[in-house]
Design a protein with these regions (language model features):
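Conserved phosphate/anionic-ligand binding catalytic regions in large, soluble enzymes, centered on
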Residues: 34-52
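A glycine- and small/hydrophobic-rich beta-loop-beta segment
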Residues: 212-247, 251, 280
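Hydrophobic alpha-helical positions that pack around
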Residues: 60, 99-201, 205-209, 215
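Gly-rich Lys/Arg/Thr-decorated short loops/hinges at beta-loop-alpha junctions or inter-strand turns
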Residues: 62-76
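Ferredoxin-type iron-sulfur electron-transfer modules in oxidoreductases and energy-metabolism complexes
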Residues: 235-243, 251-253, 257-335
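Mobile "lid/hinge" segments at catalytic clefts and subdomain interfaces of large enzymes
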Residues: 52, 56, 67-68, 171-174
């Protein structure tokens, strides 16, 4: 299984190249579904389904998300430097499917912005944005570029906004050209290269130290026999193995772009039990990893936040099951009482009847 620096996806004999400018939106969407393309910015949601959902809520804005905000990760940057034209082709394919009124390209590298400006066509805009932790988030990106605020209880597609990672758009262009999704660019300890999807992560980064799937700040420790998937943009060494005790400096609270009480969440997480009083804060956390980078003790605070969130999810599920069980029990008791009363009434009625033998 090759792990090369410049090996590109090869032509699949089962995929016939499509002239996207002449093809119908249904034909293009069908190819995207056939290629099994998923969100490659981390979500992993089937792209064809996401586009189809946006189709139902015109008018549409399409955003190419090149805001790579994970510290030390350069996969999107390298892709844009080497295959910007393919990314723009993917953007135009999606815009055609949706009959989009405007397309945006958000990039965190000024030189690439200059390159993109010379390739734009009508109804396309490229914007340079600072690579902050929040600027790469879907909802924040929509607000910055379109001025529209997506409600917390809604989805961007419901508001006619579709955000796709630049890797996803590249994969779309490749699929339309007859090339399946078999590889992706991955940053492995500051080196970015093409790696086969399906490669065991332990083979990608051979290290005596534990590793994380994703960048150090937001990645997770791999499961047994875990392999590279299309949504993984980095493999990193795990610095948290050298973590020191918390010194209560408060840097994590200051670093959090959503002003969450990170240190308090960490203290609660260390108690190894659920705490539903902080559920709102856990819901507002978007796992950006800013607290992890800020921590001078190398504590992976996001691990603890995720663990507390998982314990709360389990607790809410337990409460829900207990509530449903209580409702079923009360309904059964009521039914038994009703049956008993009905039986007593019928018995009393029979006793009062005039029988033939009397």
């Amino acid at each position: 299984m090759s792990i090369g620096s410049e090996v590109m996806p090869s032509l699949n004999p089962s995929f016939t190249p499509i002239n996207w400018e002449q093809a119908t939106p249904d034909t293009l969407l069908e190819r995207i579904a056939e290629a099994k393309i998923v969100g490659m910015g981390g979500a992993g949601f089937p792209t064809a389904e996401k586009i189809a959902l946006a189709q139902k809520h015109p008018p549409n804005f399409v955003i190419a998300n090149g805001m790579e905000t994970d510290p030390g990760v350069n996969a999107d940057k390298v892709l844009l430097e080497r295959h910007l034209d393919d990314v723009l082709t993917g953007l135009r394919i999606v815009a055609k499917i949706l009959s989009a009124v405007q397309s945006f390209v958000a990039i965190a590298h000024e030189r690439t912005v200059q390159d993109a400006q010379s390739l734009l066509i009508d109804n396309e805009t490229v914007r340079y944005l600072k690579p902050t932790f929040q600027n790469g988030a879907e909802r924040e990106l929509i607000q910055i570029l379109t001025g529209h605020v997506v409600k917390d209880n809604s989805f961007p597609a419901f508001d006619g906004c579709l955000v796709l990672n630049v890797h996803t758009l590249f994969a779309i262009a490749e699929a339309i050209a007859g090339k399946p999704l078999t590889k992706r660019l991955v940053t492995v300890n500051d080196e970015t290269r093409w790696i086969d999807i399906g490669t065991p992560v332990e083979e990608i980064l051979e290290s005596r130290d534990p590793i994380r799937v994703g960048c150090y700040a937001t990645g997770k420790r791999p499961r047994a026999n875990e392999v590279l998937t299309a949504k993984v943009n980095a493999i990193s060494n795990d610095k948290s193995v050298r973590a020191l005790p918390c010194i209560h400096c408060g840097w994590c609270d200051e670093a959090c772009p959503r002003e969450l009480p990170v240190e308090s969440l960490f203290v609660l997480a260390e108690q190894l039990k659920p705490n539903l009083d902080v559920q709102d804060a856990l819901n507002r956390c978007n796992d950006c990893g800013a607290c992890v980078i800020a921590c001078p003790s190398n504590i992976h605070l996001l691990d603890h936040v995720r663990a507390l969130r998982q314990r709360n999810d389990t607790e809410r599920e337990r409460i829900s099951r207990a509530t449903q069980a209580r409702i079923r029990f009360d309904a059964r008791e009521q039914r038994l009482r009703s049956d008993a009363m009905s039986s007593d009434a019928k018995r009393s009625e029979r006793m009062q009847q005039q029988h033939k033998w009397q």
